[in-house]
């Protein structure tokens, strides 16, 4: 996987966290830069670790599916992308019922884990490709940190408008990456 594909994957993986952070930011009284950076760091670290876990699981199973590796990567990315699109379409607007000034660590960590499960599944798929998993995981973590930080700060203004569309866009990008992997492996474009 080349640098551009890695960066696009990292950006796509950060869309769940961005959408969640927008909702978290929308539910805060006045999100500060400190709170946004704290949230971004929590989301980024967790999002960077989950593809490493998935990659380790994929490596353990790789000898059994080497002949189908491109189909596995495509299938996982397609399913995850479709799931993100469906969840984005179903997602309701962010709730503004009560507005704390700060979210607790465990709430943010649990939200980060929930939004990073797709990165773990992507890590499984990446085990079947020629990628530097550490670089990819760091790119995913850095992108997620940036996007979650921005999401908190933008949440107050964009929550009702952008939240669901960010997730839909992330799903479309994942399906595109999966299709690109399949087309490249099958040699359909030369």
UniProtKB/Swiss-Prot annotation:
The keyword Nucleus does not apply. Keywords: Cell inner membrane, Cell membrane, Ion transport, Manganese, Membrane, Transmembrane, Transmembrane helix, Transport. It is a multi-pass membrane protein. The keyword Repeat does not apply. InterPro entries: Mntp/YtaF (IPR003810), Put_MntP (IPR022929). It is found in: Cell inner membrane. Pfam families: Mntp. The chain crosses the membrane at residues 3-23, 41-61, 65-85, 106-128, 142-162, 168-188. GO terms for molecular function: manganese ion transmembrane transporter activity. GO terms for cellular component: plasma membrane. Belongs to the MntP (TC 9.B.29) family. Probably functions as a manganese efflux pump. This is Putative manganese efflux pump MntP. It comes from Erwinia tasmaniensis (strain DSM 17950 / CFBP 7177 / CIP 109463 / NCPPB 4357 / Et1/99). The lineage of its organism: Bacteria, Pseudomonadati, Pseudomonadota, Gammaproteobacteria, Enterobacterales.
């Amino acid at each position: 996987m080349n640098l551009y594909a890695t960066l696009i994957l990292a950006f796509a993986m950060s869309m769940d966290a961005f959408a969640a952070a927008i909702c978290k930011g929308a539910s805060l009284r006045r999100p500060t830069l400190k709170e946004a950076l704290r949230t971004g760091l929590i989301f980024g670290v967790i999002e960077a670790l989950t593809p490493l876990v998935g990659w380790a699981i994929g490596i353990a199973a790789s000898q059994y599916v080497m002949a189908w590796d491109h189909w596995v990567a495509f299938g996982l990315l397609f399913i995850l992308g479709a799931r993100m699109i469906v969840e984005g379409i179903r997602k309701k607007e962010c709730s503004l019922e009560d507005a704390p000034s700060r979210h607790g660590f465990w709430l943010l960590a649990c939200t980060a884990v929930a939004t990073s499960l797709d990165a773990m599944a992507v890590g499984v798929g990446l085990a079947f490709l020629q990628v530097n998993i550490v670089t990819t995981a760091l790119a995913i973590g850095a992108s997620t940190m940036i996007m979650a930080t921005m999401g908190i700060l933008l949440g107050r203004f964009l929550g009702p408008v952008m939240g669901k569309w960010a997730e839909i866009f992330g799903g479309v990008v994942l399906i595109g990456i999966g299709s690109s992997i399949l087309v490249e492996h099958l040699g359909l474009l030369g």
